[in-house]
Regions:
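Catalytic loop of the DD-peptidase/beta-lactamase superfamily, centered on the K-T-G motif
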Residues: 2-3, 8-16, 22, 35, ...
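Short, solvent-exposed turn/loop segments enriched in Gly/Ser/Thr/Pro and often Arg
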Residues: 22-31
């Protein structure tokens, strides 16, 4: 049984989540759907839905706040929903129990500014908020972000869905709502976090400037461009095809990573992905002892080995 069918049968249908699905194909048939937005080249603009069904369990549930509220009702009800026990209280309690300790450092100091402890349960981040256990998880895909949080002791849960990717507003708005519900003093959580967020943005910009400044001008590729064309393979990511088209190299890597290569320095090329959500990347080619192209390094996606040409 597929993951999609299992969720529909065991979760969506029993909870009455009639507008919830797990694929972009199903979502695209609806007339009442938000358009995703993302900052692309510094400007907020609509972006296309990305088909990520192959990693569906990592973040492919399409829903609305009414449906998601039913999920939280079941969580806060110890597995019971409208008088029926859909999951045992012991099972849910185990998912809300710390399994892995998380060091509160780096970005976590922004997301959880007052937390005294942090851990990960089974699909939930766990920390403390105003002296009570906070159970929550956020996530994002291109142009969309979600935040689902609850404080079981206070019997309160919150769902915030946005059609803007990369925003931290849902996290801080959640805290603001919890404060109001529990009668706590009002705090502008986002304003307090802003200096740290800006500092991280400056670090990112500085790293990018450093990379640009490291370019060695006046260099040329070791070989003719046609020698770099071919198929390269990664056991994890599959094939990337480098082609010579009209005197320029292009890269084809799945449905989203397609772009034109521009010489950077030596045997390194900058690739400008046509899907501007992905920005730019680098491809560093390596030669073997015979002076032939042996592999290409694609940064975070790792090394791809040259596939011998068919004779």
């Amino acid at each position: 049984k597929s993951w999609d069918d299992f969720l529909t049968e065991r979760i969506f249908t029993p909870l009455g989540m009639k507008d919830t699905n797990t694929t972009i194909r199903t979502l695209s048939k609806s007339n009442d759907v938000s358009t995703p937005h993302q900052k692309v080249d510094g400007k907020l603009q609509p972006v296309a839905w990305r088909l990520i069904d192959n990693i569906g369990p990592a973040g492919s549930i399409n829903s609305n706040v009414v449906d998601m509220a039913q999920w939280l009702r079941m969580q806060l009800g110890n597995g019971k929903f409208d008088g029926k026990q859909l999951a045992s209280a012991a099972t849910l309690d185990e998912t809300h129990t710390p399994q892995t300790v998380i060091r509160r450092e780096g970005p976590y100091t922004i997301f959880y500014p007052d937390a005294h402890f942090m851990s990960y349960g089974m699909g939930w981040f766990l920390s403390d908020f105003r002296g009570k256990k906070l159970v929550e998880h956020g996530g994002a895909i291109d142009g969309m972000r979600a935040e689902v949080a609850m404080i079981p002791e206070a019997n309160v849960g919150i769902v915030i869905l946005t059609n803007v990717g990369g925003t931290l507003l849902p996290q801080f708005l959640t805290y603001r709502i919890f404060d109001s519900y529990m009668g706590q003093p009002t705090r502008d959580w986002q304003a307090e976090a802003l200096p740290k967020i800006q500092a991280l943005e400056k670090q990112g910009a500085a790293a990018q400037e450093k990379a640009l400044a490291s370019r060695v001008t006046g260099t040329k590729p070791s070989l003719d461009l046609k020698e770099y064309a071919g198929k390269y393979n990664s056991e994890m990511y599959g094939d990337v095809e480098i082609k010579l088209d009209g005197g320029k190299l292009t890269a084809e890597f799945g449905p989203y990573f397609n772009g034109e290569l521009e010489h950077w320095n030596y045997d390194t090329f900058q690739v400008k992905w046509r899907d501007r959500v992905e920005g730019n990347g680098f491809m560093q080619f390596s030669l073997n002892a015979r002076g032939k192209v042996a592999s290409v390094d694609m940064g975070a996606m790792g090394n791809f080995t040259r596939v011998p040409d068919k004779k």
